């Protein structure tokens, strides 16, 4: 279980409060206006921002003393963070060994991960040769190799067209179900939230609200969400 316990995050004049729980294996959408703090929330969970107050707990353990690399978290950004001068195999290998000291078993795992996301045979290709959808699949494969139980998605598929984005969300859902990962996904698109998540966190007006059932939240949106969605 991931628990945000009376969390307060400060960045200059901006503050964000959160008190929420995500069950192990749950998929949760995070939605709200631009600048509301959605990415800030994910960065705090990943360990890149220290909360001013409160705790972030995973399975009852306080993650506060742990740096980003020590947390059981993988974070995917919109730009995918693939190194253009490295092959896909090397980019994925960084998820296993930052020094790229890869044994035969590691190389086999990389090949399996590429096959799982539909990129079999492209291990020697560099990111510049790939489409946006293929780059998203490669970044997802790297997260899969890290095998962390918490997966944070900061709009990694926002630049894709509707069909490719739906395909990627379906793939993430499949992998999360297979691995039991807890997934928090930032999105601006209500349809993505409906398609992907049973519950949704609304981030607005300096608060990350407790997760609500997605269908019910959009059927009867609170004022902040109604203002965001528009008429």
Swiss-Prot record:
SMART domains annotated for this entry? Answer: AAA
This protein's major location comes to membrane
Q: Where in the cell is it found?
A: Cell inner membrane
Q: Where does ATP bind?
A: 32-39
Whether Mitochondrion counts among this entry's keywords is: no
The record's InterPro entries line, in alphabetical order, gives: AAA+_ATPase, ABC_SmlMolc_Importer, ABC_transporter-like_ATP-bd, P-loop_NTPase
Which ranges carry the ABC transporter domain?
2-230
In the UniProt record, which is one GO cellular component term?
A: plasma membrane
Q: Which GO terms describe its molecular function?
A: ABC-type thiamine transporter activity; ATP binding; ATP hydrolysis activity
Highest taxon in the source lineage: Bacteria
**Pfam families in UniProt:** ABC_tran
Known catalysed reaction(s)?
A: thiamine(out) + ATP + H2O = thiamine(in) + ADP + phosphate + H(+)
Keywords of this protein's UniProt record, alphabetized?
ATP-binding, Cell inner membrane, Cell membrane, Membrane, Nucleotide-binding, Translocase, Transport
In the bilayer, the protein is annotated as:
Peripheral membrane protein
Per the UniProt record, which EC number(s) apply here? 7.6.2.15
First-level EC class? translocase
According to its UniProt entry, the function of this protein is described as: Part of the ABC transporter complex ThiBPQ involved in thiamine import. Responsible for energy coupling to the transport system.
Q: How the protein assembles, per its UniProt entry?
A: The complex is composed of two ATP-binding proteins (ThiQ), two transmembrane proteins (ThiP) and a solute-binding protein (ThiB).
Describe the family membership recorded for this protein in Swiss-Prot or TrEMBL: Belongs to the ABC transporter superfamily. Thiamine importer (TC 3.A.1.19.1) family.
Name listed for the protein in its UniProt record: Thiamine import ATP-binding protein ThiQ
Starting at the broadest rank, the lineage of the source organism is: Bacteria, Pseudomonadati, Pseudomonadota, Alphaproteobacteria, Rhodobacterales
């Amino acid at each position: 279980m991931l628990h945000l316990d009376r969390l307060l995050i400060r960045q200059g004049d901006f503050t964000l409060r959160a008190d929420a729980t995500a069950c192990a294996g749950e998929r949760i959408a995070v939605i709200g206006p631009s600048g509301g703090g959605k990415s800030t929330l994910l960065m705090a969970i990943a360990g890149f921002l220290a909360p001013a107050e409160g705790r972030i707990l995973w399975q009852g353990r306080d993650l506060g003393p742990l740096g980003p690399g020590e947390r059981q978290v993988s974070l995917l950004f919109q730009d995918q963070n693939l190194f253009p001068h490295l092959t896909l195999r090397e980019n994925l290998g960084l998820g296993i060994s930052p020094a790229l000291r890869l044994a035969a078993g590691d190389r086999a795992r990389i090949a399996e991960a590429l096959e799982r996301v539909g990129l079999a045979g492209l291990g020697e290709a560099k990111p510049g040769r790939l489409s946006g959808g293929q780059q998203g699949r490669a970044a997802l494969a790297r997260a899969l190799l890290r095998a962390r139980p918490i997966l944070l998605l900061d709009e990694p598929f926002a630049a894709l067209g509707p069909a490719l984005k739906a395909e990627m969300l379906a793939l993430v859902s499949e992998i999360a179900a297979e691995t039991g990962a807890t997934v928090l996904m930032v999105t601006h698109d209500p349809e993505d939230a409906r398609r992907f998540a049973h519950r949704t966190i609304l981030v607005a007006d300096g608060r990350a609200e407790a997760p609500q059932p997605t269908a019910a939240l959009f059927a009867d949106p609170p004022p902040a969400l109604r203002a965001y969605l528009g008429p």
